[in-house]
Structure formats: structure tokens, C-alpha cells
From Swiss-Prot:
It comes from Streptomyces davaonensis (strain DSM 101723 / JCM 4913 / KCC S-0913 / 768). This is 8-demethyl-8-aminoriboflavin-5'-phosphate synthase. It comes from the Bacteria. Changing Y53A: Loss of synthase activity. Involved in the biosynthesis of the riboflavin analog antibiotic roseoflavin (3,8-dimethylamino-riboflavin). The keyword Lipid biosynthesis does not apply. The gene is rosB. The record marks R13 as: Important to position the amino-group donor glutamate. Changing N94A: Loss of synthase activity due to the absence of substrate binding.
């Protein structure tokens, strides 16, 4: 089965405005094609992705207001279908963009386990990162974004982040600054594409067999103070129940939010 890569351009510039980040993406796409990987690029800001979330995304209108339809279910389906997810983000204020952060927040709600594998839905998928900016911030953004994607189930290979940084102060962007001729950036893009492609092939052949339910149960039995995740396919928000091990007496129940 052919592997698929989805690259999310999280620039804050809508089409048809020029995106410096798209310049980095344009270097990565043909490299994925050489690897035999089908690649799709989505500019997130061009689509209606609500920042708000609901306990039950499919049926939230039990309250006073009806949920306004947005395009998150459409984008989520593309993320589910992709073997490789690459977040491509400008660096703003030493961070990823708000559009990238919304994607991470939305994915953080995907806590349901696959009934067959007993794993999170993003297991056996690979994550990569492209960053574009000036001055500093690339290592900080890589650390936070890739760590969060790994916590959500993605596998992160070595050298999974590539970036271009301009000179200190205001200066030309990736396109005007001829970032496509910059050795270190070109090297890192090739590292990222090669390693995400390699790991995706490995996981297609030999996926993880970790049973998260069994691991949680074993941990529960050896622990005195247990936070057990209540998993519900139709209610993506994570709920925690805290139990006192002695007698399994329920002492607290809360919902993140």
C-alpha cells in the first residue's frame, strides 16, 4: 500500500498571499515523491477551523446554542489517513503560529483507543516539522511541537525537524533570502524526508503491538494513587477518575477544560 504524507502549512497568510513557509514545503514535496510517497499540502488558514471544542463534537447542540459547522472533521480525516504528518510553521514570538497550536489542541482531544489494537489513533504514524523564521526559536519550537506529537502517539525519527532562520533583525524571508540555496537548511530537509519516510515504511511492515489498556491496568494494580483515563469514542475530551486503591473508593472526578 502506498504511503501518504500530509503537510500542514500553518502560515497566518491566506492564499494567494506569498508564504515563506511554502518555500520550505516546495523543497520537501519532490523529495517525498522520490521516496514514492504521495504528498498533499493543506494551508490551514484557508479553511474554517474553529478554535472552540466540544465534549461531543458530533452532537454538541444539547446546550443552549447549536454548534456551527466547520472544516475540522474534514481535516481530521486527512490526518487520520496520512502515514506521515508534517507541521510546517513560521516562527513567531519564539513559538509556532496560533494555527499550528490549534491543530495540536484539536489532536489532543483524540484520546479514544482503537478497539482492536488498544492504541491511540495516531499510533504507527510518523511526525516531522518544517520551520521558517528569523533569529532564534527553531530548537524551542521543535522541542515543543515534536514532543507533543510524540505524546499523542506519533513516532518521531532522528533529525525530524528542518528549519531556515534569517539574520538577526528584520530581513529577507526564506524566498527573498534564497533559503533554497542554504546548505544547512537543504541538508536538514533531506534528513527529515528520508527519516520520516524510512520510519513510516518500518511501521507499515511492523506496527507497534503495545496494548495501552493492558499497560494501564498493570500500572493501576501496582499503584496506590491511580489516575485512570476514561476512554469514550464519542466523547473526545479526556476525563480522569481518581481512585484510592484501598477499597477502590472514588474520591474525585474532573474534566480537563
Amino acid at each position: 500500500m502506498a504511503l501518504k504524507a500530509l503537510i500542514l502549512n500553518t502560515t497566518l497568510r491566506r492564499s494567494p498571499s506569498r508564504s515563506q513557509t511554502q518555500g520550505l514545503i516546495d523543497k520537501a514535496v519532490p523529495l517525498y515523491e522520490k521516496e514514492g510517497i504521495e504528498t498533499e499540502v493543506v494551508r490551514v488558514i484557508d479553511h474554517d477551523i474553529e478554535q472552540e471544542y466540544w465534549d461531543d463534537y458530533d452532537d454538541w447542540n444539547a446546550g443552549e446554542k447549536a454548534r456551527r459547522e466547520d472544516e475540522w472533521p474534514w481535516l481530521l480525516e486527512k490526518i487520520r489517513e496520512a502515514d506521515i504528518l508534517v507541521i510546517a510553521t513560521p516562527i513567531t514570538l519564539n513559538m509556532c503560529t496560533s494555527a499550528a497550536h490549534v491543530i495540536l489542541e484539536k489532536l489532543n482531544l483524540m484520546d479514544e483507543l482503537n478497539g482492536d489494537t488498544k492504541q491511540f489513533p495516531l499510533y504507527n504514524k510518523v511526525a516531522g516539522l518544517l520551520m521558517c523564521g528569523n533569529e532564534d526559536g527553531a530548537h524551542h519550537v521543535a522541542g515543543t511541537v515534536l514532543n507533543n506529537l510524540g505524546r499523542l502517539g506519533y513516532s518521531v525519527p532522528p533529525n525530524a525537524a528542518a528549519y531556515w532562520l534569517g539574520p538577526a533583525g528584520t530581513g529577507p524571508g526564506y524566498i527573498e533570502g534564497k533559503g533554497d540555496r542554504h546548505f544547512h537548511t537543504n541538508k536538514l530537509i533531506r534528513f527529515m524526508v528520508a527519516n520520516t519516510s524510512h520510519l513510516a515504511r518500518m511501521l507499515q511492515e511492523t506496527p507497534y503491538t503495545t496494548d495501552l489498556e493492558a499497560c494501564a491496568q498493570a500500572a493501576r494494580e501496582e499503584s496506590d494513587d491511580v489516575f485512570a483515563i476514561r476512554v469514550n469514542v464519542n466523547t473526545p475530551a479526556i476525563r480522569y477518575k481518581r481512585f484510592q486503591k484501598l477499597g477502590e473508593v472514588k474520591v474525585e472526578e474532573s474534566q480537563l477544560g
